[in-house]
Structure formats: C-alpha cells, structure tokens
Amino acid sequence: MMESIKKLRELTGAGMMDVKKALSDAGNDEDKAVALLRERGIVKAAKKADREAKEGIVRFVVEGNRAAIVEVNSETDFVARNSDFQALVEKLAQTALSAKTNDVEEFRNFSMDGETVGTVVAAAAGKIGENLVLNRVAYIEGDKVAGYVHSNGKIGVLVDVAGGDETKAKDVALHVAAERPQYLSRDEVNQDDIEKEREILTNKALNEGKPQQIVEKIVSGQIGKFYEEKVLPEQRYVKDNSMTVGQYLGDASVKRFVRFEIGA
C-alpha cells in the first residue's frame, strides 16, 4: 500500500491523504485511483513520474529523399559536449542511412568499420570512460525530407512532406521540435483513450456542480482542445499562430515525422 501511495504521489503530485483515499475507493487499483483524483479536481492531468534525466545528443543525416536519425545517451553533459562523442554520433547517423532500419537492436548488429555498431559504441565507451547507450534510431524515405536539431542536440526531428517544398518541410520540422505533436491525424488516436478521457472529464464537471445540460458541451470542447494540442495538422503553427499547421501546408501534407528528445 505504501509503495502505491508513493508511486501515485510522484505520478500526480497529489497529497498523501488524497492519494490514500483514492486508492481505498478504487480498491487499490492504481489506474482507477489516478482517474478518481482527476475527477475530483485534485490533479489536472495524469502525468508520468519524473525520471532521472539522461544526457546525450541527437544527430541526423539527410541525403536527397532519405534521412536517418539516432539518439545516443551518455552519463554526463560533459561527455555529450565532447568532440569525440559528437563525431561518433554523427558517424552513427551516417551509418543508419545505410542500415535503413527503425529497430535499434537490428542497428546494433549492423556492420560499421569492420565491427558491429554495438561493438563500436562499446569501444567508444571504454575510451571515453562513460557508459554510452545507443537508444533510438529511425529511417525515413519519401517525397520532401527535412531534419532539424534544437537545443544543442537535445531534440532532433525528421519529417517527410508530400506536395510541399524544402522550406515547408524544414518549417514543419522546426514546429515538431517545438510543439511535440503526438499524432499525424485524429485516426491515429486510440479511441478507447478518448472515451476514457471523456468519462473522466464528464465526472469531473459533474463533481464541480456543472449543470448536466452543459456538461456534454464542456467536455466536447475539452476533447477538441486535446486534438488541437496533440494532432500535428491541428496545432497552431509555431511561426504564425493565426493559422494551423494544416493551413500553413495548404495542399501539402506530412506523411511521417520522427521526434527524439533526450530524456523523453
């Protein structure tokens, strides 16, 4: 019980007594307890517990209509800023372009300098003196491909834009880095999650004393806002919030995007 209380306090930021009561009312079901806390207005949204931040950098390579991106973690920011480490990550990105994979385990076994990628990373770790982890890799091939790295390599993005030019592709990559979209369209959103969210928001509004006849309107507005925050074409465009990303793109469309962020 105490372990669950500690976990939910970290997860929601709620007080001990509120968490304890929610767990009791939920029959010690942690997910149900989080939903109860939200319905009671004690927390605004379920959020993940803070995790120890990983250091490292993200690098990408674009060649024509192909691109690859990698994330490599280090123990300290000092190593992340080390020129040897940065050169390694850049070479890994170039190698990923040849590997054409989105599977990090497959990439670790890919050939590089007569060794496997995993062996090369392990050797670099021994030389640098820190544990290095090849965390993620992605490869895209499409129409107009562009990339963007932000915040000293802490965030990296690749996008594939169909029907657009290089400027639009680069602008969308910058937007994705800044605004953290999660979906390309509403169709990608798990409808079970939406219904669960709708139920929580409905119960919360009713618990706040909102009249039944306006609760549905309130909840629909909040669900719409969820889509506006999470679905790329519906987000307000970062360079001009008078329009959405979809409006900025016009006849063009984003076919795929990849966003890596250190520690996320």
Swiss-Prot record:
Which residues lie within the region annotated Involved in Mg(2+) ion dislocation from EF-Tu? 76-79
Task: Keyword check for Cytoplasm, yes or no.
Answer: yes
Q: Which Pfam families is this protein grouped with? A: EF_TS
Supply the name of the protein.
Elongation factor Ts
> Keywords, A to Z?
Cytoplasm, Elongation factor, Protein biosynthesis
Primary subcellular site in the record, as a coarse category: cytoplasm
Q: Which PANTHER family match?
A: ELONGATION FACTOR TS, ELONGATION FACTOR TS, MITOCHONDRIAL
PROSITE patterns given in the database record: EF_TS_1, EF_TS_2
Which InterPro entries does the UniProt record give? EF-Ts_dimer_sf (IPR036402), Transl_elong_EFTs/EF1B (IPR001816), Transl_elong_EFTs/EF1B_dimer (IPR014039), Transl_elong_Ts_CS (IPR018101), UBA-like_sf (IPR009060)
Its biological purpose is as follows: Associates with the EF-Tu.GDP complex and induces the exchange of GDP to GTP. It remains bound to the aminoacyl-tRNA.EF-Tu.GTP complex up to the GTP hydrolysis stage on the ribosome.
CDD domains cross-referenced by the UniProt entry: UBA_EF-Ts (cd14275)
Record family assignment: Belongs to the EF-Ts family.
Highest taxon of the lineage: Bacteria
Q: Which GO terms describe its cellular component?
A: cytoplasm
Q: Which GO terms describe its molecular function?
A: translation elongation factor activity
Q: Where in the cell is it found?
A: Cytoplasm
* NCBIfam families registered for this protein in UniProt: tsf
